[in-house]
């Protein structure tokens, strides 16, 4: 079978899919078809009949706009992606959305489209592979042994996140990571030399990568030799620089930006079919080409061989094998619920007035002993975020058995790498930075929410309570923006008990990211009944109450809860009927049934004050237009925290004053 014709099947399906949708990007799939054919048919270990086989190679299309490439590959290889699915490219509720989306079609390892994040996810997958191998492989038993392959274009390399990720990949010596640069010299605006003239091979050599330059991306033998050389280099990641022609096969549009992001048109597709010698109708693939592409039997054989290896491992190391299966399945330890409930009860029984960032570290200490799957990290702020605990061990190029990654000052890279670790499986990953600097990482957290993957972020120094560092470091609008992100769970605890509950729920939440927001300054622990402790998980609960119906409700989060309690005590002493609601997680509260929400915030009680050292406007949903909000309406200032809280109205006196005005 002629390899060019096998690659032309990808080109034809890509042209046809984009044309039928009247939307899409045919250029990259047509340009990378030869590379994809060699990789997928001669090297990629995968099983179309079990896309979740734990030791499969991972393939990431970082230049996700070229999605017809991966859809064509999955269809031709025998995954459950039909020709009708390809005909439904970019249509509502299809398995083939405009950019590849995790969870839609089997075999899609990650959602890509925002350029640079796919290569970064791939770095995370390669870290996970290296760490799992170091933790579980034994002499003569390599049960974790797979490659991560990634296709990326000029756009990925222009994005700053590619520097963050590829720099760290070199430092960590990710020898099982192999990236293909689609060096076609074209972007949306035209020829890239006017805005992208880097010496990319030297750039990657400087990162510590193994670089294979100047590979003809349309020569199957050259591509194959490059992949063999890349696989043989086990101590460094490899960049294969493939020179390609965008839109290869299109006689009048190849090599130009005209074929990047628009259908070729019926006349040009007809001309391309003639140029390529492709004599078949749109979406028609002859049986001999299907047969040559079909990977089902080979994939099943590869997985069966691995099953035999794993059976031998399980016989020699039964405890490790059981633990590996538990972790890859994403199951928590059997004693999890009992142990964590006891930890939380003990915290309530032994009050401590500590910063919630310290409470977070204590939770890591307690829960970490139960979770060998923890994979922590921080963007060069471990002593401030307090993300290391006594069991933390640094993961390095020389020893990947560690459970803590020093990400350096790479917030965006860290967050997207964690997405890759989560997608790979076998770990409960978390990262950390100051809340203000989640701004650098926002799109990766959005991607975690979109993909519904577990990415736990610890965001400390959560308000003007940061003090002297000033408004560049003081978050204002960040908490609200996290809360408004669909499928994100955001927690701002008020003491060590709420902090531990937030951590417990984040660890249990496998289908979404969590943002855990902690203070720099010490916070008073609140007394609670067992019922109140249980209600923390509901996101909002009655912390202090009056006899009968309240005339005023104070709603507060985090460091402002003790302020609400102090105001409650003063107002109660003056005979006012006041309730305090602690609301560490608005999204968790919003998910409760109507009866519970009414019990906490009765509709009849319209006099409400929300108190939070974050943007004020967020709270109208809970206080109504008749309520009041003590919050931020501007950026902060540089001064000691106590002075700032006073300046911006976060004092008992101001809360009491506002309450009395509302009750008057």
Swiss-Prot record:
Record note on cofactor: Binds 1 Mg(2+) ion per subunit. Can also utilize other divalent metal cations, such as Ca(2+), Mn(2+) and Co(2+). Binds 1 thiamine pyrophosphate per subunit.
Binding-site residues for thiamine diphosphate, renumbered to this chain: 65, 113-115, 155, 184, 260, 437
Pfam families associated with the record: Transket_pyr, Transketolase_C_1, Transketolase_N
Residues that, per the record, bind substrate: 25, 260, 357, 384, 461, 469, 520
Keywords: Calcium, Magnesium, Metal-binding, Thiamine pyrophosphate, Transferase
Residues given in the record as Mg(2+) binding sites: 154, 184, 186
GO cellular component, one term: cytosol
Names of required cofactors: Mg(2+); Ca(2+); Mn(2+); Co(2+)
Record site: Important for catalytic activity: 25, 260
EC number: 2.2.1.1
Catalytic activity as recorded in UniProt: D-sedoheptulose 7-phosphate + D-glyceraldehyde 3-phosphate = aldehydo-D-ribose 5-phosphate + D-xylulose 5-phosphate
SUPFAM superfamilies assigned: Thiamin diphosphate-binding fold (THDP-binding), TK C-terminal domain-like
Active site: 411
GO terms classed as biological process: pentose-phosphate shunt
UniProt-recorded Gene Ontology molecular function terms: metal ion binding; transketolase activity
Highest taxon, organism lineage: Bacteria
Subunit structure: Homodimer.
Function: Catalyzes the transfer of a two-carbon ketol group from a ketose donor to an aldose acceptor, via a covalent intermediate with the cofactor thiamine pyrophosphate.
Sequence similarity: Belongs to the transketolase family.
Protein name: Transketolase 2
Gene source species: Vibrio cholerae serotype O1 (strain ATCC 39315 / El Tor Inaba N16961)
């Amino acid at each position: 079978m002629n390899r060019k014709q096998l690659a032309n099947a990808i080109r034809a399906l890509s042209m046809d899919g984009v044309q039928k949708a009247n939307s899409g990007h045919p250029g990259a799939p047509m340009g990378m078809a030869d590379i994809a054919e060699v990789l997928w048919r001669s090297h990629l270990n995968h099983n179309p009949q079990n896309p979740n086989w734990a030791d499969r190679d991972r393939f990431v299309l970082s230049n996700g706009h070229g999605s017809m490439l991966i859809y064509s590959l999955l269809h031709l290889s025998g995954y459950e992606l039909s020709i009708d699915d390809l005909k439904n490219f970019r249509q509502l509720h299809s398995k083939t959305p405009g950019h590849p989306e995790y969870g839609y079609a089997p075999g899609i390892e990650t959602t890509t489209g925002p350029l640079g994040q796919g290569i970064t996810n791939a770095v995370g997958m390669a870290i996970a592979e290296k760490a799992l191998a170091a933790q579980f492989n034994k002499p003569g038993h390599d049960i974790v042994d797979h490659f991560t392959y990634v296709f990326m274009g000029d756009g990925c390399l222009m994005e700053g996140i590619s520097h963050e990720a590829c720099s760290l990949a070199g430092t960590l010596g990710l020898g099982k990571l192999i990236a293909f640069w689609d060096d076609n010299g074209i972007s949306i605006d035209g020829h890239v030399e006017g805005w992208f003239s880097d010496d990319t091979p030297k750039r990657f050599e400087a990162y510590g990568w193994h670089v294979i330059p100047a590979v003809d991306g349309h020569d199957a033998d050259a591509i194959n030799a490059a992949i063999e050389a890349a696989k043989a280099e086990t101590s460094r990641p490899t960049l294969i620089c493939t020179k390609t022609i965008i839109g290869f096969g299109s006689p009048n549009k190849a090599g130009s930006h005209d074929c990047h992001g628009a259908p070729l048109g019926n006349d040009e597709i007809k001309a391309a079919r003639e140029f390529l010698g492709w004599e078949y109708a749109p979406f028609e693939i002859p049986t001999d080409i299907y047969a040559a592409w079909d990977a089902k039997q080979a994939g099943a054989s590869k997985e069966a061989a691995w099953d035999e290896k794993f059976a031998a491992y399980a016989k020699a190391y039964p405890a490790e094998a059981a633990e590996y299966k538990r972790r890859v399945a994403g199951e928590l330890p059997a004693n999890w619920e009992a142990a964590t409930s006891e930890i939380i009860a003990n915290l309530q029984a032994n009050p401590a007035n500590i910063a919630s960032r310290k409470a977070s570290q204590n939770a890591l200490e307690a829960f970490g002993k139960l979770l060998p799957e923890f994979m922590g990290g921080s963007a060069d702020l471990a002593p401030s975020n307090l993300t290391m605990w006594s069991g933390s061990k640094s993961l390095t190029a020389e020893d990947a058995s560690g459970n803590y990654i020093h990400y350096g000052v790479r917030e965006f890279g860290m967050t997207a790498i964690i997405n890759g670790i989560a997608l790979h499986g076998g770990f409960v990953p978390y990262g950390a930075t100051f809340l203000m600097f989640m701004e650098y990482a926002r799109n990766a957290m959005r991607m975690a929410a979109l993909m519904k993957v577990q990415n736990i972020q610890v965001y400390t120094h959560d308000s003007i309570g940061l003090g002297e560092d000033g408004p560049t470091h003081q978050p204002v609008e960040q908490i609200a923006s996290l809360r408004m992100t669909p499928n994100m769970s955001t927690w701002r605890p008020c003491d060590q008990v709420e902090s531990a509950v937030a951590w417990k729920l984040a660890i249990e939440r496998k289908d979404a990211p969590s943002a855990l927001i902690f203070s720099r300054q010490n916070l008073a622990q609140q007394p609670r009944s067992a019922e109140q402790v249980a209600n923390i998980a509901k996101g909002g609960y009655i912390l202090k109450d009056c006899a009968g119906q309240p005339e005023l409700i104070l709603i507060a989060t985090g460091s402002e809860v003790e302020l609400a309690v102090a105001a409650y005590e003063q107002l109660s002493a003056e005979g006012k009927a006041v309730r305090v609601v602690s609301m560490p997680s608005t999204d968790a509260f919003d998910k409760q049934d109507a009866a519970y929400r009414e019990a906490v915030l009765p509709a009849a009680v319209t006099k409400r004050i929300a108190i939070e050292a974050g943007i004020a406007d967020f709270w109208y949903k809970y206080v109504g237009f008749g309520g009041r909000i003590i919050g931020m309406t501007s950026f902060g200032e540089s001064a000691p925290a106590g002075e700032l809280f006073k300046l911006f109205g976060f004092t008992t006196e101001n809360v009491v004053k506002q309450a009395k005005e509302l009750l008057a």
